[in-house]
Amino acid sequence: MRSLWLLVFSFSVLTGTNMAFPMILSERPEVTGSFKVKDTSLTHLTVHRKTGEVFVGAINRVYKLSANLTETRSHQTGPVEDNAKCYPPPSVRACTQKLESTDNVNKLLLVDYAGNRLVACGSIWQGVCQFLRLEDLFKLGEPHHRKEHYLSGAKESDGMAGVVVGDDDGDLKKKKKGGSRLFIGAAIDGKSEYFPTLSSRKLVADEESVNMFSLVYQDEFVSSQIKIPSDTLSQYPAFDIYYVYGFSSRTYIYFLTLQLDTQLTQVDVTGEKFFTSKIVRMCSNDTEFYSYVEFPLGCTKDGVEYRLVQAAYKHRPGKILAQALGLSEDEDVLFVIFSQGQKNRANPPRETVLCLFTLHQINLAMRERIKSCYRGEGKLSLPWLLNKELPCINTPKQIGDDFCGLVLNQPLGGLMVIEGIPLFDDRTDGMASVAAYTYGDHSVVFVGTRSGHLKKIRVNGVPPPSENALLYETVTVVEGSPILRDMVFSPDYQYIYLLSDKQVSRLPVESCSQYSSCKTCLGSGDPHCGWCVLHNKCSRKEACEKWAEPLHFSTELKQCVDITVTPDNMSVTSVSTQLSVKVANVPNLSAGVTCVFEELTESPGEVLAEGQILCMSPSLRDVPSVTQGYGDKRVVKLSLKSKETGLKFITTDFVFYNCSVLQSCSSCVSSPFPCNWCKYRHICTNNVAECSFQEGRVSSAEGCPQILPSSDILVPAGIVRPITLRARNLPQPQSGQKNYECVFNIQGKVQRIPAVRFNSSCIQCQNTSYWYEGNEMGDLPVDFSIVWDGDFPIDKPSSMRALLYKCEAQRDSCGLCLKADSTFECGWCLADKKCLLKQHCPSAEHNWMHQGRRNIRCSHPRITKIRPLTGPKEGGTRVTIEGENLGLQVREITHVRVAGVRCNPAAAEYISAERIVCDMEESLMSSPPGGPVELCIGDCSAEYRTQSTQTYSFVMPSFSRVRPEKGPVSGGTRLTISGRHLDAGSAVTVFLAQEECLFVRRTVREIVCVTPPSASGSGPSSVKLFIDKAEITSDTRYIYTEDPNISTIEPNWSIINGSTSLTVTGTNLLTIQEPKVRAKYGGVETTNICSLVNDSVMTCLAPGIIYTKREAPESGVHPDEFGFILDHVSALLILNGTPFTYYPNPTFEPLGNAGILEVKPGSPIILKGKNLIPPAPGNIRLNYSVTIGETPCLLTVSESQLLCDSPDLTGEQRVMILVGGLEYSPGMLHIYSDSTLTLPAIIGIGAGGGVLLIAIIAVLIAYKRKTRDADRTLKRLQLQMDNLESRVALECKEAFAELQTDIQELTNDMDGVKIPFLEYRTYTMRVMFPGIEEHPVLKELDSPANVEKALRLFSQLLHNKMFLLTFIHTLEAQRSFSMRDRGNVASLLMAALQGRMEYATVVLKQLLADLIEKNLENRNHPKLLLRRTESVAEKMLTNWFTFLLHRFLKECAGEPLFMLYCAIKQQMEKGPIDAITGEARYSLSEDKLIRQQIDYKQLTLMCIPPEGEAGTEIPVKVLNCDTITQVKDKLLDAVYKGIPYSQRPQADDMDLEWRQGRLTRIILQDEDVTTKIESDWKRLNTLAHYQVTDGSLVALVQKQVSAYNIANSFTFTRSLSRYESLLRTSSSPDSLRSRAPMITPDQETGTKLWHLVKNHEHADQREGDRGSKMVSEIYLTRLLATKGTLQKFVDDLFETVFSTAHRGSALPLAIKYMFDFLDEQADKRQITDPDVRHTWKSNCLPLRFWVNVIKNPQFVFDIHKNSITDACLSVVAQTFMDSCSTSEHRLGKDSPSNKLLYAKDIPNYKSWVERYYRDISKMPSISDQDMDAYLVEQSRLHGNEFNTLSALSELYFYINKYKEEILTALDRDGYCRKHKLRHKLEQAINLMSGSS
């Protein structure tokens, strides 16, 4: 079998996860590069295996990125006009379905290395593919005209996979002929008649070849494809096969698929759907698909089945894994990720598992299945194929590994699931993508998750060994954003590229540098990482110097350097000591080491044998302060530094200790360091010389002086008594030392009492009494200590305390006194009726009761409180009785009766002396009376009997109403039950049917409880109460209703802080009492409130989330859970089907410097910030509120700033911004007025003015009348000036705001507009013969035979170069041969020679050479060459470029030109346009700018299109100042968007109806009987004139010719037609101002028409009007705003024209060829001035061709160009010309505005032009042969566009006119005489004249 090279590209990348080691969660920023998008979604990723360049597929885009993810190219693939029901697509055949702007979803992206191109397959036009050049993404082709070109129109981006197979056998001819093959599997979305599910296609070299994507083999019976039978789809409409991953291995092609399990899924469409995973295999050289085998695939872990394949990756195992599997290292394994179960393909469970399959295992299962089938066993068993029930046919056949099937027993399915080996499972993150590679002997698997993380897993074995898969690191890539399937390594395997919805990320495959120690490095489990010993770093071995030398690079934990120091501690008082350092596992240290004690000292180490090093500890002067502030010790790092590397390579702890810090004997002697306690000096020291035995040295805890533990020391307050304590080792005070003292701290007061030491083991505080203030506490814990010699404390147990107590405090009754702790020795003194010590009670023997006495009872019990006070007569009420002296034991309580009814005491609830709890028995009376509580203690004698003052009553509770009356089945409703006596009794239980309602609270009139879930579903339930033993019922019912449901949340996003408004729609919402919305993120739940609007709508404030990382990603984060708390409706707690996104909170920059900004009143304020408009879909935006001081301001919001009008305030005002519950204050505004006069100055001026005024008054009396008039004029002027100033400010501010907001809107409006290119013939005719629609060259020549013969003879002459040159030169020599004639002859010649372009080019070059020669001979400036059309050659050159640049216009330059035209048109129409003068609010031309303030308002009309029905209305934006014709034009533009102008109705053919109900229809016209006439001015009707309102319904209907219409429109049609002819001309004017139509009186009525502005030059313009006019130049700011809005489109056009790359298109050959010709001519004539060459090229191409096209886009597109668009295009064209000029532009304030407008841009454009010319000159020259071949091809394509005979007939006119001159010229030329050209011409003339 011939060798094959197999290139595999899969668009499914896998994911895995496992737990096993000390896993690292990497928080540091791992992503080393990223590429982000906002306006699209990314779908696929591939990396060039040689260059490392990254290619990314997206919706409507393909990007090319550098290896570090910098964008280098992008290619637009959509949107396009399409409809999924159009087959073939509308690009091939007109479709009856409505076309809509459709996104192109990239579904397949792979590199065809053999063809050196990128294959990008999308979803539009039934799934066509584009071939893009790898270098620049230039579109090489997009085959879309055959059925084989349509792969699948399904929209899902992850249902397609492909494998490329290419020939590599060295047979170049065969290779060129055959090319590569593409095996492609695709989900077909139910369209099996259109698309195969799996096929093998040809990839031929020519992208436009008819064979591209054709099936590798096809005859009438068999082909290289498999289709899903239509019967399968009719039975299971949801059936499809989704291709997850494709790859090749040896001679086979494999696909992993996910498909509907037809055996588990019910036929019923609404039933639950089950899916199964399968692996498909075919031979790579099988053209008939006989080898197709399909087997189920799955994995089981811990008894749980995983059947939903998510991603996969083929890999050759590392040595360790291969050995564990028993494989050789060149055999392939497959890592596969599955989700749990078989449901939810679109949103699979997060419980996932990473499994391993060997291809040996898979192939073995398939081979055995094939063998059994060929033995005739079983059936074909492919569930989704019609022949699944066909039996296998017994066919003797040797089945080996290379068997590729026969015509029978195929396609074949397996029934047994091939089970994978589970390696790692994950139950939270949800694994979604996987990739693997081998590093050293290890297999490393990288897994992307749905939570945006990357898991790194080392796979070295399989079960049963425990270390089968080790998760050693998790890296955050894009938090909350799922990692998509495509994960690809860089060619050198240093990086891995990951893809999410909005970002491509590049991460290093390892991050060894994050580990700072050998143990964490080698313990991480990362196989890339080892410890570089002398460099003290974790790295790959390649990054470690001398890694191959012994012990330089460690890879195992046991190889980590070990260090021990002897001794390992020293006192801060010790002198410098030699330390012995022992190190193990170190390389040769012969270069030397130094010993470093942190920042203290560094000294050389002496290296001895066997890893021993001697170091010196720091000297005494370096150490004293080392432990200061560190307590009794400080640990410092002792490090060894290698002199070889200059780095510390091992560090250990060394301790400096300080005994003197320890203040007690026990802490001193228990120290781990050699500290001794000197008890007579009361110090701790390590120096034994400082403390001899005579000084009481103690070295063990047993020898410490200490008080021994005992129980609490009880001290009765006020009683004088000694306190004796047991002790040990109490020292005898020496001479000069003070004796012992007891120190008590009572309520902050210190009490010192002398103590007596009896011996070393006993001490006594002498007789004294102790007291504490107040009786609030019965006992008070007191701090105490024993000290000697002043302040030397004796150690005592920390828990030991003294307790000071008073018997009478808080014990004011006999019962409470006798309850006291018996150790207090308190008793009740009957005489004093107090709780006292025995010695304080007189006649204690008789009067003092205490616990020691038997059978004591307290007399005179008293009841203070009973509860409850009411209860049912049925009993069961638990009554609580509180009081004093209520017995000491429960057995003393007898005879308890409540209102005469027995009540049984509950022993467990009894509190001695204070409380009795008893249970009521039933009253046997029908209406028992109430009464007090009675009880006895012991017996019922008078002194032991009591009765309560409160009375207990029997009541009959009842209820009559519940509210609310209904609630959800799941319960949770707070139910209020209303009635009487509902607070009776001690316990209440509420039942709804048989379920208990959870009690909340109750009062006398109501009970509140929370409803339980209904056990019987919806419907009414009975309500029943149990109060103690009483059962209460009623007829009242509570109704359970269906649980509420949530259908939509708008918007489905908020900001991190939440509190933005959400509108929630659903059902049954009114049954919920307190709805809340909830979110859970990072384990923290947050909620916010909702308000019910009606049963189907509620509004909520979004809950915020706690986001702890620095900043949320721009793409947003998704909460772990999002849902609603609707009572107990648990189904809505988590809404997994509603993805909710949290975007970063907006932030704002401080105002000005230090948060203060100075502004004038009314000035716009810019508040800059970030994240102001979240990148969420839809039109909902954040609601901002800005206040300045207390005053709100009007806002304009953009992505990075708020534009705010400051209010009319002055002084310091704080700015506050409110959004989503957040408040920001970016600072203070200092608003200052223009007044600069101080108060004294004003007073001074006022006083001086007063004196002056008195003098002036006397003078003015004489001139009273004149003064009054002057004063009135002055006031009027002042008023006008104020008015003018405010309007100027308003105008500037409007222009500024427009500039900020228009650009984005305009760009959005441009998206998806289809370009209406003219066909080739119309395009060339408009350039060659502008303004002539029906030219003779387009028609057949109807002429006699002799004329045709004469013209053919004339044609032969024209094809003689010398004749043609003589003919042209002779014509040009004639005075009467006008400029128009020259252009006409040039165009006729090009039309006649269209079929011989190579000959026309030769003639053109000669004519240009002659023109250059003539130019130089006449001593004209060389720069004037080709400047004007003064010769036939110049117009021929224009036509030549017109012919040859047509394809370039269509493929490249046409788009930015059309976008510029559309942008201008739309921007102009956003503001008022004067229908008469053509002037507009938005303009680039000063001459076409409305220089007045026009008040207008935007309206949205709902338009019913012609032949449209109700309900098909289209919203269209118009202005209320638009004339009716202007409105009709805008409506037609909207209705016929994307339709060429010539194919749609015109405004004049339509009437505009305003519909105000069913019957009222008003026809609106520019002029009718309602038209306003003032003086002799008549104003055109506008929408405002008719008072049309926003949202009005209008219709476009065919114009009806009626008497009404004639009467009302005759005058207007006649008077306006002359302006229409001027405004709608297709040619560009020489002078824009001269084009404006003059307003002349109507011939019949004498009135003049106007629309927005009256002509200022007209004689009757009243002078009084000037008062209301603004200085017109102020409106020039609008030019700048318009220019800014259109800048992007102008730049795009210029960049396309002046770029050799042309966004992917090659430079047209014609440009390079002609530029080289001009350079040759300059060289030939020794012209070295570069400016001359530059000018020739500029005059040749930009001036002759591009300027013409820019000014007249209607030459290229089927569009209408109005006068304002024409004026703007002329400004752009002039800028284009200026950019090509070499002369300097000197500009001043008097320069034309269009020159000033682009003054800053022109130098940049000039540099583009210079670079363009320079790049072209550097390109390799085009040979004449190559150019001729290209020209011949052009002639073949377009040779029949014009009628040659008709063109010749038109040219003959000039032969006839200048016959004598031409014949004479032929006579004079030697060549012409020799070849008798005169004779031949005369023959033609005679034949022609014969016809006449």
From Swiss-Prot:
IPT/TIG domain boundaries: 861-955, 957-1041, 1044-1143, 1146-1232
Q: In which tissues is it expressed?
A: Detected in primary motor neurons in the embryonic nervous system.
Q: Which residues lie on this side of the membrane: Cytoplasmic?
A: 1262-1892
List, in alphabetical order, the GO biological process terms annotated in this UniProt record: axon extension; branching morphogenesis of a nerve; cardiac chamber development; embryonic skeletal joint morphogenesis; motor neuron axon guidance; regulation of cell migration; regulation of collateral sprouting in absence of injury; semaphorin-plexin signaling pathway
Stored Pfam families: Plexin_cytopl (PF08337), Plexin_RBD (PF20170), PSI (PF01437), PSI_PlexinA-B (PF24479), Sema (PF01403), TIG (PF01833), TIG_2 (PF18020), TIG_plexin (PF17960)
The alphabetical list of record keywords is: Cell membrane, Coiled coil, Disulfide bond, Glycoprotein, Membrane, Receptor, Repeat, Signal, Transmembrane, Transmembrane helix
Coiled-coil stretches noted in the UniProt entry, renumbered to this chain: 1262-1315
Q: Which residues lie on this side of the membrane: Extracellular?
A: 21-1240
Report the record's disulfide bonds: 86-95, 121-129, 283-404, 299-355, 373-392, 512-529, 518-560, 521-538, 532-544, 595-615
Span of the signal peptide: 1-20
Segments spanning the bilayer are 1241-1261
Drop me one GO molecular function for this one: identical protein binding
Family annotation (InterPro entries): Ig-like_fold, Ig_E-set, IPT_dom, Plexin, Plexin_cytoplasmic_RasGAP_dom, Plexin_RBD, Plexin_repeat, PSI
Q: How does it sit in the membrane?
A: Single-pass type I membrane protein
Q: Where in the cell is it found?
A: Cell membrane
PANTHER family given for it? PLEXIN, PLEXIN-A3
- Give the family this protein belongs to, as stated in its UniProt record: Belongs to the plexin family.
What is this protein called in UniProt?
Answer: Plexin A3
Lineage of source species = Eukaryota, Metazoa, Chordata, Craniata, Vertebrata
